[in-house]
């Protein structure tokens, strides 16, 4: 454990930041899972709505430094591909 006051403060801040980041990361994963579950259920409108809700959450995670922008782009691309595949499947 730290002995210097500033080190103690940084330890407290690090713990608070860790908890906050964990909550944000959990929210991110939840929204991504909602899209995947909606696609797997075969409900196109539900999947599209879930995707529309997930995109701003993914983008805000990048702005907060939670994930890298390339990971965000990859996640959005893969989710969108799933939704589009469902739309094509529903159309045919």
UniProtKB/Swiss-Prot annotation:
**Keyword presence, Membrane:** no
What are the entry keywords? Ribonucleoprotein, Ribosomal protein, RNA-binding, rRNA-binding
Q: Which GO terms describe its cellular component?
A: cytosol; small ribosomal subunit
**Has the keyword Iron-sulfur been applied to this entry?**
no
Q: Where is this region: Disordered?
A: 1-20
Q: Which domain of life is it from?
A: Bacteria
Q: Which InterPro entries match?
A: Ribosomal_bS20, Ribosomal_bS20_sf
GO biological-process terms attached to the record: translation
Q: Name one GO molecular function term.
A: structural constituent of ribosome
Family, similarity comment: Belongs to the bacterial ribosomal protein bS20 family.
Q: What does this protein do?
A: Binds directly to 16S ribosomal RNA.
Identification of the protein by name: Small ribosomal subunit protein bS20
Q: Which organism is it from?
A: Methylococcus capsulatus (strain ATCC 33009 / NCIMB 11132 / Bath)
């Amino acid at each position: 454990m730290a002995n210097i006051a500033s080190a103690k403060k940084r330890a407290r801040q690090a713990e608070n930041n860790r908890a906050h980041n964990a909550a944000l990361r959990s929210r991110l994963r939840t929204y991504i899972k909602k899209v995947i579950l909606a696609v797997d259920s075969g409900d196109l409108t539900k999947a599209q709505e879930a995707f529309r809700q997930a995109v701003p959450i993914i983008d805000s995670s990048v702005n907060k430094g939670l994930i890298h922008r390339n990971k965000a782009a990859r996640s959005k691309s893969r989710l969108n591909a799933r939704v589009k595949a469902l739309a094509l499947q529903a159309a045919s």
